[in-house]
Swiss-Prot record:
Main enzyme class: ligase
Taxonomic lineage: Bacteria, Bacillati, Bacillota, Clostridia, Eubacteriales
Subunit: Monomer.
Keyword Cytoplasm: yes
Catalytic activity entry: tRNA(Cys) + L-cysteine + ATP = L-cysteinyl-tRNA(Cys) + AMP + diphosphate
Name the UniProt record assigns to this protein: Cysteine--tRNA ligase
Gene that specifies this protein: cysS
Amino acid sequence: MIKVYNTLNKKKEEFIPLTPGEVKMYVCGPTVYNFFHIGNGRTFIVFDTIRRYFEYRGFKVDFVQNFTDIDDKMIKKANEEGITVKKIGDTYIKEYYQDADALNIERATVNPRATEFIGEIIKFVKGLVDKGYAYEVDGDVYFSTKKFEGYGKLSGQNIEDLQSGARISVDERKKDPMDFAIWKAQKPGEPAWNSPWGMGRPGWHIECSCMAKKLLGETIDIHAGGSDLKFPHHENEIAQSEALTGEPFARYWLHSAFVNVNNEKMSKSLNNFFTAREILERYDADVIRFLMLSAHYRQQLNFSEDLLESAKASVERIYNAIGNLENLIDEVSREEMNEEEKAYLESLNKYKEKYIEKMDDDFNTADAITAIFDLIKDTNTNITIDSSKELAQKALELIRELGAPLGMFQKSTKGNLEEEIEALIAKRQQARKDRDFALADKIRDELKDRGIVLEDTPQGVRWKRI
C-alpha cells in the first residue's frame, strides 16, 4: 500500500487511483525563458522518481508535464533580445531536454506547450464566463474568487485572510482584489490571439487547468509541483477547474520543498541560483540525483559544494560495490549457487522489503537509499572470490533494481573506472619520479578512499579493490 502526503487534506493518505493500476499525473513544468536551475531540477527529479516508483510497483503512469511558453517573463526576454516569443520558447525547450536527459529524467508521456492549446483555453474561459464565475473588463477576463466557495482550501487560508495578507496590485476594474486574470488583453509588442473579448493571451493559471483537463480528464489522480506553486497557482487551478466542471480537479496534491542557498530559497529573482547545466559540467547525474533525493522531498534541502562532494563520495561507494561484483562475475570459476548461497541470497530480500516499505511511505528516498547502503555493506562482506558467479550476478541485479526507481546506479564500472585508475597511477608514478612525494601520497590516499589499494611490486604497480 502506497501512502502519499496530500497537501489538500494536510495528511498522509492511502493512494487509491481512479482507475485500478493506472496513475494520471500532472506536474507543472518550466517557463521556458532560460536554463532551469538546480532548485527547479529538484522538482523535476523528485517527480520523475515518484513516477518511476509507481511504474516499479506495477502502475501504468500517464505523466504530463507542461511547458509555459507564453508568459510575461518570456515576452520581456524576447523584447530584450529582439526575437519572437516563439523563438525563445523553441530555444529553451530544446535546452530543457538536453539538461533533463543529462540528469536521467525520463521523458513525459506528453509535454504540452500552452500555445498549442489556445483554442481549448478560450473555450475554457468562455465556459467560466457563461457560468458566472468570470467577467470581462476592457478585454481582460477575471475569475471571481468569491463566487467559488472553496477558494483557499489548498493553502489552508480563508479568503479574508488572503485579502488582508496578500500584496495585491490595486486594479480598480476588478470586483475584488483577489480576482485573477484568466485572459489578458493585448498590449503593444505582445503576441496575441483572437477571442470573444478581442485580441489577447491566456493567463498563466488557466493554461495548466486546460491542458490537464484536455490530456488527462476532468479529475486526475495527482497534481504536483514545487511548494512555491501552492498559492496562488495551484489554488487558482482548483478554483477554475472545479468551477467549470463541478468535479474534483485532483485527488492528491504533492509539493516538493525548496532548495536553499545560505538559508534562502534558490531563485532567479534572488540571483542566487546555479543552473543544472553548470553543475552537470562538474558532477555526474548520479551525484546530483543522490543529493536531491538524500532528503525527503517535503523537506527543504541546503545546496553547497561540500554536500555535492559528500554525495559524490557516497555514489562512489555504491559504484565500488558494483565494480567489485562485476569483477567477481568475470573472475570467479564456479558458475552456479550452492544451497548455502541460495539461502544467503534469499536473506538479501530484507533490504528490498525495507526499501519498498520506505518508498511506500510517501516516497522516503532518504531511507530507501540507506537500505541500498545496508545491502552493499552486506554483499561487500559476504560475496568473495570463493562465491559463485550466479550469486554475484543476482546481488548486482538487486542493487540495480533498487537503484532504478531513483534513476541511479545503472552504469557499468568496466572500462571507464579502470582507465581513470590507471591514469591516476601514472600521475603518481610521475610524481614519485619528480620526488613530489606529497602528491604521490595524496593520490594513494585518494584511491584508498575509493576502495582501491596500490601494491608496489617488482613488475610495477598493481591495484585491487578492497
